[in-house]
Amino acid sequence: DFPKDSLKIVDIEEVVVIATPKENRKLRDLPVAATVLSQENMRANQVNSVKNLTGIVPNLFIPDYGSKLTTSIYIRGIGSRINTPSVGLYVDNIPYIDKSAFDFNYADIERIDILRGSQGTLYGRNTMGGLIKVHTKSPFTYQGTDIRMGAATYNNYNVSLTHYHRISDRFAFSTGGFYEHTGGFFENSARNNEKVDKSNAGGGRFRGIYLPTSNLKIDMTVNYEYSDQGGYPYYYTGITQNGIAKAKEKGKEITEDRADYIGKISYNDRSSYRRGLLNSGVNIEYQACNFILSAVTGYQNLNDRMFLDQDFTERDIFNIEQKQRANTISEEIVLKAKPGKRWQWTTGAFGFYQWLHTTGPVLFKEEGVKTMIENNANSAFEEIASKPGAPTMGMTVHNPTLSVGGTFDTPTLSGALYHQSTFNNLFIEGLSVTAGLRLDYEKISMKYNSLSTPVDFDFDFHLAMGPNSINLSDQNMKAPASFVGKLSTDYVQLLPKFAIQYEWKNQNNVYATVTRGYRSGGYNIQMFSDLSQTELTNSMMNAIKESPTIGQDATWGATIIKMMDQMVPAKEINVKTSTTYKPEYSWNYEVGSHLTLWEGRLWADLAAFYMDTRDQQLSQFAESGLGRITINAGKSRSYGAEASLRASVTKELSLNASYGYTYATFTDYVITEGQKDGSSKVTADYNGKYVPFVPKHTLNIGGEYAITCSPRSIFDRVVLQANYNAAGRIYWTEQNDVSQSFYGTLNWRTNLEIGDAMISFWARNFLNKDYAAFYFETMNKGFMQKGRPMQFGVDLRCRF
């Protein structure tokens, strides 16, 4: 029979059985806060990619902004916009190491498991917030050919075809492909109102399962996806309050110079992201008499290009073109006890190696050379000239463009050993105790080669000395800047887990857990653009000192060098200190319960948590605006609660609701600045401020009403589905001066089913709610991406 779109309370883990190498029981029987979504759940909630999971899962927030490169996942007060993720992702038991690969098409996905809270003992690094496990359909349990076609407003189209074939009792396979086109939602006023975010994507997947014997299974997967999209539709919001305050502290005043562009997207260059993503893997499972052995091998190749108009304006200032080429190979060997034993245990070894090659040149255009290099230098000279007895200096830069280049190789090696044991029915019936420990080793290194175009500049120096004056100048001096070197560091982590659980009835339990989480450190390669600017300044000063007509002038050279050393001292550059960010750690405490009530017609999942995080990683733009960096923010504290309810009210009507509350604040985050006398001055105190990008509340309320039609009707069933998704308040900055208030979007779907076919009419953001999906600040200016507007669509599914 055709699978019905129904949200009645059925045990998804029994209907969609997934072989997992590590867990011994169903997720609702374990001491963990988890949400399981079937393919029917995903259709009802219009989940087409990982970014559509926001709100459906309590305390999960994944802002939909930028491009496929930017998959920022926040759970329970922690998350990441760039570099290492705080939430892990596994697809068919194979880890996706790089978050640049997290956003992919869900055309063939059968089930998604979302585990909240640290999963470090069994899954290791970068799962301190939780874990998302994605499972594709098994051709052994599902046969036939699925065809899906869809169209929607804003010129959106998609089509997919997948064939599932069971050749014999020993071999089955599935193969298929998809294509999707997005016409774009947002317009660029600087480029004749062209759509900023239009995109095309396509790909294919193959999965083959071979059973050589009754106790041996070999599961092979290969998939490839290519996408080419416009992106980064950021509206200008004006001069920031923080920028005004900082200028005021320095006795300066900044005023709005782009008032006509507030509320508009206005880039002169088209920003885009292009990605090719190949994944393959082999799962081997051997069932012995007393244990199950699994060996999982994975390989991923990612090749992408991001082009970003990084001044985010209609002016021709500067842009960045970042290219990544990553190859990752992973291997995991797991031994676990067979289900039903009093002693349930899991022992494993895991390792991966990633080769990552990145190029990220920043190109200053003619206006950028003028405003950000020449004018900045002359502004500093004017400030010096305002002091009594100071010289007058001026600079002219001749470069029509200036490239601040960078080539980086950042390989990562990781290995781990782990064990977890659960003792069931300990002392009394239903009481279980779990203890586990993981030893995790990681080595990261960076080989960098950052070369900048030499600055071609003229310099004038004038100083009045009584009746005499010094007038010196030189033309076409050259100032290069380069960084070439290698850094490496390694970490050893112990990730323990303790849990106690009491089960008094099947799928009725309470539990308490204590776990330690860990997120990897790394290197900020985009920081080299900032360092290069500093090095260019030092290099220009050196060129002036070495000039035969200025610094080497026979009469005044020594005096000028001494004066310049006092007025424009060289800045020391420590590459390691400037580019390295430390690992993030957390201790996580949780109590919860899984309840099955009302004769199985009501499910309730409850949890409360407390997280103590140290060296929390935060993403922000560098002060120059030339790139994003990760910094460590001291300590933070997060606590909250979650509740999920599902009820089958009648045979026709089912309801569901989920709510999450998170209170995440900094407890030790103070920024100081060294003074000339050796003392430190507090420049920012964020203690007590809310952690950015973490909604205080998430809410999802949904329902379904299924009508079984009479035999004389055209349709067999009509299914009405609706859900309301909400989140907020969300603070966007550490200062907590910009935020998005609590907001919600209403979505609905109507399915008309006849035999093995179904046509669906749907709407997203039906009330056309206007809200900010993302906000950031750079160079004292604010930018925002709006949430997508109201959209209507129709889908056709057919199986034969």
Identify the residue ranges that each predicted region occupies.
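C-terminal beta-signal and adjacent terminal beta-strands/loops
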Residues: 518, 655, 724-733, 748-800
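Short acidic/polar hinge/loop motifs at secondary-structure boundaries
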Residues: 92-116
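Periplasmic-side early beta-strands and strand-to-turn transitions of outer-membrane beta-barrels
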Residues: 141-142, 150, 166-261, 265-267, ...
